[in-house]
Amino acid sequence: MSGYPPTSQGYGYGYGGGNQPPPPQPPYSSGGNNPPYGSSTTSSPYAVPYGASKPQSSSSSAPTYGSSSYGAPPPSAPYAPSPGDYNKPPKEKPYGGGYGAPPPSGSSDYGSYGAGPRPSQPSGHGGGYGATPPHGVSDYGSYGGAPPRPASSGHGGGYGGYPPQASYGSPFASLIPSGFAPGTDPNIVACFQAADQDGSGFIDDKELQGALSSYQQRFSMRTVHLLMYLFTNSNAMKIGPKEFTALFYSLQNWRSIFERSDKDRSGRIDVNELRDALLSLGFSVSPVVLDLLVSKFDKSGGKNRAIEYDNFIECCLTVKGLTEKFKEKDTAYSGSATFNYESFMLTVLPFLIA
């Protein structure tokens, strides 16, 4: 199913009359024998089976939150000089001082609040999510991973493909102009061109909201902002043809998953159906997290204990975005990651203030 005109059955979305198959590589779904991100594998201790308690890990390579006092240096990660002191020899002075006070020479790479990361710090992607992880671990369903690029597309990955999920980088980075690749679904091109009334090659948040509404995909402005943030990796509040195509196909895939999970055809999915939907996307989350998601995205304030399609999309965007950011730091696929204060704030705030 690609596009959203009415079909002959189901929810009535899909421009091919319901008989046209979805894209050959639907985005953000668990494929083949790849276990969902967060599920148990025989070769990786990344997570325990669904609902089971997590065993004690014998590895101490990544300290867990709460294992030491806030601000204390991790045992295996000595602090590097702050950005302004890279060329100065560190002084023998312990990390400390009042929160927000100027850091001493030789302070950690946490540095003072607002300080940037070390310029020589590697991204920690290990080939990017979608590459084969170490120790034979699967790519967790390739959720967020970049598929193979089509040959000679000339568009940095090609339309119909999905952008590599690298580090978000600067949240205020500008978008690179792009165009539609040959063979792009004409409905997608027409939808974008109708929204791009000024012919700038970009559409803003209100234009995107209107374009999706024309295909009976009505979303709140908060959901639209989350879509733009995750598909552009920036807060530019505009989206080009390349990102719009990936977004369009992803929404198509997520609607298909919602329809399959809504077994009673109520137009809402409960906590068990949400669990199945997230597993289809490649995520195995705990019962506590599932209950929290349903409570958060239930329009009735938790009375129905179920979420509708538009809030399901926002739920998927939240789980997808936070998991990708966590995986950037979890380079060893250990289930643990270390964030400095600024990284943590930049990770969480876009989902709180979208």
Swiss-Prot record:
Binding, Ca(2+) 2: D262, D264, S266, R268, E273
Signal peptide bounds: none
Binding sites annotated in the UniProt record for Ca(2+) 1: D196, D198, S200, E207
Domain EF-hand, chain residue ranges per copy: 183-218, 249-284
Coiled-coil segments on the chain, per record: none
Composition-biased stretches (Low complexity): 1-10, 28-71, 106-117
Keyword Membrane tagged: no
Biased composition (Pro residues): 72-81
A GO term for molecular function: calcium ion binding
InterPro entries reported in the protein's UniProt record: CML48/49/50 (IPR044590), EF-hand-dom_pair (IPR011992), EF_Hand_1_Ca_BS (IPR018247), EF_hand_dom (IPR002048)
Alphabetical UniProt keywords: Calcium, Metal-binding, Repeat
Claim: Calcium is one of the keywords in the record: yes
Organism superkingdom: Eukaryota
Region (Disordered): 1-159
Cross-referenced SMART domains: EFh (SM00054)
Protein role: Potential calcium sensor.
Protein name: Probable calcium-binding protein CML50
Organism of origin: Arabidopsis thaliana (Mouse-ear cress)
Originating gene: CML50
